[in-house]
């Protein structure tokens, strides 16, 4: 018997974006357990916090019944500054494929946050024990920019099981965090292998591999991938595979000023180091090429940036480093204008895949090559 994760998100500082911080609201979302087990526990993160934060209530709803989650026996508890901690183990028989609803009330502001669940909604006040929920609130800017409700502080959900999963981590940016290719791929793995393999999402919106974006807004994009790699990827027990899907944001910050940090040479060196570390640990590495970015309205995109993206993709395709490669660029690009995403496959901003684009990416994976079962 051992603990195995069924849900995970990587954390970034929320102080630049108040709507991420969660104070005095309840966040509700659902997860599917890929394994059967006897107990459940939840891990909380306060990596970026300068002071403790308080969870004012946490419940798990399974088959219409409420189960209260505690820490040190208390329904109200704090998460220490600069640390992670677990809840008490909740005795709760969980069946493979079962849907669990998580309700979390924040009594204070939380610094660690992310938004990876399209089904997440929020309510003002504490609604963790309500038998019926009121209509959820949804900010207009979320729909406008394709954002999800944030789930502050919650880091991982684990089930105590006799059949621990082998873990594959999707290490990426918003294209990963939005879950439009990760969840369909996770479902394909589940349908093919049951709980033998689980795909965890370690994407952070705006994240770069090589570059820490400056300013308060930049901080909310998380530490650069080379810095967060150990915390967000290597610490997984049972890690067997990593999908590398970072770099398209680095390209957008390329200039004469950043050229010493963001270049094909720096990208290749950083990726080679990551792959070497993973291979030494017996972990398979899967590369994704960088998708088209031209037309993305939030940043000017220069010919030099596009040339760098193209050269990085050529390097990925030609490299013998990887155990497997999926060509996201070739899948998503407009055949008549290959620096742009095909109009059928983006959410309206010319960068982020819509449901059809995400499904196309997920279906492109050969599961035997992904898992190493081939």
Language model features with spans:
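Conserved SGNH/GDSL esterase-like catalytic core that processes O-acyl groups on lipids
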Residues: 28, 58, 157, 165-270, ...
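Surface-exposed amphipathic alpha-helices with a cationic face
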Residues: 271-282
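Catalytic His-Asp segment of secreted/periplasmic serine-dependent ester chemistry enzymes
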Residues: 252, 290-374
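N-terminal secretory targeting modules
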Residues: 1-171, 177, 183, 190-194, ...
């Amino acid at each position: 018997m051992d603990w195995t994760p069924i849900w995970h998100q990587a954390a970034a500082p929320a102080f630049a974006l108040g709507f991420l911080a969660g104070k005095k609201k309840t966040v509700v979302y659902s997860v599917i357990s890929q394994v059967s087990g006897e107990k459940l526990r939840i891990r909380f993160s306060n990596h970026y916090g300068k002071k403790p934060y308080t969870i004012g209530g946490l419940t798990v709803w399974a088959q219409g019944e409420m189960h209260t989650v505690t820490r040190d026996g208390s329904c109200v508890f704090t998460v220490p500054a600069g640390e992670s901690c677990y809840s008490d183990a909740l005795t709760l028989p969980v069946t493979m494929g079962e849907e669990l609803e998580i309700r979390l009330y924040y009594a204070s502001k939380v610094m660690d946050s992310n938004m990876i669940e399209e089904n997440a909604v929020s309510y003002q006040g504490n609604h963790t024990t309500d038998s019926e929920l009121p209509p959820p609130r949804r900010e207009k800017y979320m729909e406008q920019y394709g954002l999800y409700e944030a789930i502050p502080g919650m880091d991982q959900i684990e089930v105590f099981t006799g059949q621990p999963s082998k873990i594959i981590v999707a290490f990426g940016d918003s294209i990963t965090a939005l879950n439009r290719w990760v969840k369909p791929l996770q479902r394909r793995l589940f349908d093919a292998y049951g709980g033998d393999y689980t795909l965890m999402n370690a994407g952070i919106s705006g994240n770069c591999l090589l570059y820490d974006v400056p300013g308060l807004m930049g901080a909310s994009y998380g530490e650069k991938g080379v810095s967060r790699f150990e915390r967000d990827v290597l610490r997984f027990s049972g890690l067997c595979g990593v999908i590398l899907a970072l770099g398209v944001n680095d390209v957008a910050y390329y200039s004469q000023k950043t050229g010493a940090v963001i270049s094909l040479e720096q990208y290749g060196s950083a990726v080679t180091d990551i792959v070497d570390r993973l291979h030494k640990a017996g972990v398979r590495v899967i590369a994704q090429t960088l998708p088209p970015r031209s037309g993305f309205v939030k940043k000017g995109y220069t010919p030099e940036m596009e040339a760098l993206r193209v050269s990085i993709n050529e390097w990925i395709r030609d490299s013998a480093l990887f155990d497997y490669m999926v060509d996201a660029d070739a899948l998503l690009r407009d055949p008549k204008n290959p620096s742009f995403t095909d109009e059928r496959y983006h959410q309206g901003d010319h960068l982020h895949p819509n449901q059809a684009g995400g499904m196309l990416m997920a279906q492109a994976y050969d599961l035997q090559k992904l898992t190493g079962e081939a």
